[in-house]
Amino acid sequence: MHFLQNAFVAATMGAAPAAATPLEKRSCTFTSASAAKSGKSSCSTITFDNIAVPAGETLDLTGLKKGTTVIFEGETTFGYKEWKGPLISMSGTDITVKQASGAKINCDGARWWDGKGSNGGKTKPKFFQAHKLDESSITGLKIYNTPVQGFSILADHLTITDVTIDDSAGTSKGHNTDAFDIGQSTYITIDGATVYNQDDCLAINSGEHITFTNGYCDGGHGLSIGSIGGRSDNTVNDVTISNSKVVNSQNGVRIKTIYGKTGTVENVKFEDITLSDISKYGIVVEQDYENGSPTGTPTNGVKVEDITFKKVTGSVKSSGTDIYILCGSGRCSNWTWSGVDVTGGKKSSKCKNVPSGASCSD
């Protein structure tokens, strides 16, 4: 499930900065996306003051100077156009991204929402492309109503802290509004995220040394590993998803792999996860996805081993299923299963190749 022509003001002295050496410290305030694109390399601190990004353009913050700080002030908005985006793209090393008190990034996704997401209808822009944003941090952003996917992460040593993505206005027509999609990344930490959306709160398609903790996920598809298989990188290793709540969502926690494809999911921990009002599956592991949907027939190409479900507890709606495990023969192994207590839904009679220690009837 997977992302500038006028005013430029130098904040400190009121004059536009000259070309900067790595040792120079210059603070720049931009009020247009075009000025930011042309002037970003001259600034060690970049402030966006109520910036309105024109329709069909990306707020281009790629190739920032090492050590740059980016601050969003006021309300950041985007013009309407049917296009793929992203609305914001950022890359660089040792970049600090934060938001001033009271500021917000308003994508106004309702202009694109048509109930089809990225599967048809209007072409919708993805929100934030964090590719090659390495050894960096994003803190405190408040983001509203992404048209489709939120953060596309392909980075090393990126920490995202206390970010809110509020797509709650899209309950009716929002679709594919994944909050955090991670691929080909290492040492990613997402701490304290608050998400209201209509798709995965977290989706890890590949990567290693990834932590998601202290999260709150409301309205979407839950906390997901996958789908795994069919990409250039099909390995997920050393992931911890912990101390989080998933409410009013389709799934609680899940691992899904692609029918007939190969890959590896290993050393994944789901710990201290609280579920509430889950409509489909509390815990789900499926090795049968094809063309985005389950087939009911698992295949053996992806191994799912050294998986921990510890203190995953809470409620599923009566129309849903507490736990569903559908593994290929011998492909799910060495699982740790403790303190799991998911209730309220049905007990599945269709589980297959459940590894020792796990259970579809807990």
UniProtKB/Swiss-Prot annotation:
Sites where a glycan is attached: N334
Keyword Nucleotide-binding: no
Keyword Cytoplasm: no
Protein EC: 3.2.1.15
Catalytic-site annotation from UniProt: D199, H221
Region forming the signal peptide: 1-20
Transmembrane segments: none
InterPro entries per the UniProt record, alphabetical: Glyco_hydro_28 (IPR000743), Glycosyl_hydrlase_28 (IPR050434), PbH1 (IPR006626), Pectin_lyas_fold (IPR012334), Pectin_lyase_fold/virulence (IPR011050)
PbH1 repeats: from-to residues: 155-184, 185-206, 207-227, 236-257, 265-287, 299-344
Location(s) in or outside the cell: Secreted
Protein name per the record: Probable endopolygalacturonase B
Organism: Aspergillus kawachii
Lineage: Eukaryota, Fungi, Dikarya, Ascomycota, Pezizomycotina
Gene: pgaB
